[in-house]
Structure formats: structure tokens, C-alpha cells
Curated annotation (Swiss-Prot):
The gene is GDNF. This is Glial cell line-derived neurotrophic factor. Keywords: Cleavage on pair of basic residues, Disease variant, Disulfide bond, Glycoprotein, Growth factor, Hirschsprung disease, Secreted, Signal. Residues 20-75 form a propeptide. PANTHER family: GDNF SUBFAMILY OF TGF-BETA FAMILY, GLIAL CELL LINE-DERIVED NEUROTROPHIC FACTOR. GO terms for biological process: adult locomotory behavior; branching involved in ureteric bud morphogenesis; commissural neuron axon guidance; dorsal spinal cord development; embryonic organ development; enteric nervous system development; glial cell-derived neurotrophic factor receptor signaling pathway; mesenchymal to epithelial transition involved in metanephros morphogenesis.
């Protein structure tokens, strides 16, 4: 808890304790019927005299004051210990924020060392950039397959690779698993700069796999 939160809680407790009714043993006895008229006239003086008597407050007031003092003392000692109570994830996050260069370096090394496998990658291009001879301002999202298929190798693929390495299959060319599209996007329709209508089929990958 922050200091202001604790102070607010203490003020609420103090207000609650001051609002408690007086104990039964400390309530003033009721005046007889004939003296009520006189009691009404003396009421302002009685209230002023009672307000100056701290012994009429309930015993909980002293407990609340002790609690407030103990809480303030604890807060003065606690800032140095708050770091030890934080979870490990929070401490690591604070350390990374203090040393951004170190955290970036570790993240880059981790990405380089991790094998992504065969994944689908997207890039924003103009249809003219595809190199198919179209002159147009039409744009598209081109998706292609990239990555390694080493993790998808079967025992058959390993045997063929070993036989090729040992030159046991010299006369035959053995193909390896490649990361290629196994499904394609919908056809793309567009007009070129000469207002000629064209349709591109199987132009962009939709799903990838090792084949």
C-alpha cells in the first residue's frame, strides 16, 4: 500500500471511532419529567462541557490511534524491503527497463538461435513489382512460404540424405523436403494502365507445408 492509501484508511477508522455511541455505563441518566424544561435551557452548557471531556469517548479511539502510529512506523521501514517482496517476473521487468540494451541483445540472440520452421510470411507490394509484365497501380498483399523443413524430416528423408552423403546414390538426384504452399489465396482481378482486365490465379500462398 502506498502512504496516501494508508493515511486515507486511518482517517476513515478515526472518523468511525469518533462516531461510535458512548458506552452504556457512561451515558448520562435521564432527568425527571419536571426537570426537563430546565435541562433544555442548560443544554448548550452541557454540550460544551461534555465536548471537552476526552474520557467520554469509547475505548476504541485509543486502539485506532495506536494502529495509526504503528502503521506509520511500519511504512517508514518498509520501502527498503518492498523490492524483496516483488515477484521474480516483476523484478526481471524492472531490470530489463533499466538495461534496455542488454535485453534487446538477448532477444535478438534468442530469435536467431530458434528454428522458425516452415511459416507463412506476408509483404505489401504493387502488382507491377511481381515482374509479370503488368503496368498498373493495383496493390496486393503477397504471401509466401519461408523457413526450414529440418524438423519435418522423416526417417526416410534421413536415410536418403545419408546415402547421398556417402555417395551410394550417385546416379540419382535425391530431392529434399521444401517449404512450399499447400493452399493458395483467391484469384486477384485488376485493371492495368491500359484498362485491360486481368486475373491472377495461384499467385499468393495461403498455407505452407514441407513437401
Amino acid at each position: 500500500m502506498k502512504l496516501w492509501d494508508v493515511v486515507a484508511v486511518c482517517l476513515v477508522l478515526l472518523h468511525t471511532a469518533s462516531a461510535f455511541p458512548l458506552p452504556a455505563g457512561k451515558r448520562p441518566p435521564e432527568a425527571p419529567a419536571e426537570d426537563r424544561s430546565l435541562g433544555r435551557r442548560r443544554a448548550p452548557f452541557a454540550l460544551s462541557s461534555d465536548s471537552n471531556m476526552p474520557e467520554d469517548y469509547p475505548d476504541q479511539f485509543d486502539d485506532v490511534m495506536d494502529f495509526i502510529q504503528a502503521t506509520i512506523k511500519r511504512l517508514k521501514r518498509s520501502p527498503d524491503k518492498q523490492m524483496a517482496v516483488l515477484p521474480r517476473r516483476e523484478r526481471n521487468r524492472q531490470a530489463a527497463a533499466a538495461n534496455p540494451e542488454n535485453s534487446r541483445g538477448k532477444g535478438r540472440r534468442g530469435q536467431r538461435g530458434k528454428n522458425r520452421g516452415c511459416v507463412l510470411t506476408a509483404i505489401h507490394l504493387n502488382v507491377t513489382d511481381l515482374g509479370l509484365g503488368y503496368e498498373t497501380k493495383e496493390e496486393l498483399i503477397f504471401r509466401y512460404c519461408s523457413g526450414s523443413c529440418d524438423a519435418a524430416e522423416t526417417t526416410y528423408d534421413k536415410i536418403l540424405k545419408n546415402l547421398s552423403r556417402n555417395r551410394r546414390l550417385v546416379s540419382d538426384k535425391v530431392g529434399q523436403a521444401c517449404c512450399r504452399p499447400i493452399a493458395f489465396d483467391d484469384d486477384l482481378s485488376f485493371l492495368d494502365d491500359n484498362l485491360v482486365y486481368h486475373i491472377l490465379r495461384k499467385h499468393s500462398a495461403k498455407r505452407c507445408g514441407c513437401i
